[in-house]
Amino acid sequence: MSPWEAKWIRHSEVRPFPQPEPITVEEKVAVMLKPEIHVKNGCHPYPAVNDLGETNSGLKTKGAPSGMCKGSGWGSQVYGRHALFKGVWAIMYSWYFPKDMPSTDFGHRHDWEHVIVWIEKPVVENVKILAVTPSAHDGYSKQVPPNPGHLNGLAAKINYESKWPINHALEPTGLGGEKQDLILWEQLSSNARHALNIVHWGDANTPFNDYVFMGKLEKAFPL
């Protein structure tokens, strides 16, 4: 497949990237702070793209909100990207969902949601979490500093939920959730990065690609 061609494959056929062994301090910190996601309703996270750059075709808004999307047999994925922003370190963690469906015929194919964890600096010991900002309907909720009850150690606990008839969003929670294999932007294959930069996901958009990542940090900046 040419890297310049977009190719969609069935939502259940996309294989995630295995989580690489972290080498740099930034990679180690990103793994340490990997959040937990609790799915209250709707789809569970799925891989969005494979190493060839083939992308998840998603699902129509038919059947039950969690119909055909209660988890991939190949395993799931959380995508990460980090940057120094206005003097602090930001790590964005993002999940893809095949559909965003409050109820039958509501919502849309594809959903991207993300949470940004803000820390003083990337250090392996004594990491200081300054804020947690989950995405919600083109905006963010902001916890500065995070509620200790919304953390499991260093992992932010995040709830994914649709409050009918509104589409899904993320929010902090006291409920435990699941973690997925983390793949950072620079660890993705070039084909996967290219696909995430150019593929149009309808009413959803990839929040960590080259075109929108810094704008998301600007919008979410909590300090």
From Swiss-Prot:
Location in the cell: Secreted; Host cytoplasm
Keyword Transcription regulation in annotation: no
Position of sequence motif Conserved undecapeptide motif: 90-100
Locus of motif Conserved p motif: 107-113
InterPro entries per UniProt: NPP1
Induction and repression of expression: Expressed strongly at the early stages of host infection (up to 24 hours after infection) but subsided quickly afterward.
Entry keywords, A to Z: Host cytoplasm, Secreted, Virulence
Domain of life: Eukaryota
A single cellular component GO annotation: host cell cytoplasm
UniProt free text on domains: The structure of NLP effectors is remarkably conserved with a high level of conservation of a central region containing the conserved undecapeptide motif AIMYAWYFPKD and heptapeptide motif GHRHDWE.
Main function: Probable secreted effector that may act as a pathogen-associated molecular pattern (PAMP) recognized by the plant immune system. Seems not to induce necrosis, neither in several susceptible or resistant Vitis species nor in the dicot model plant Nicotiana benthamiana.
Family, similarity comment: Belongs to the Necrosis inducing protein (NPP1) family.
Protein name: NLP effector protein 2
Lineage: Eukaryota, Sar, Stramenopiles, Oomycota, Peronosporales
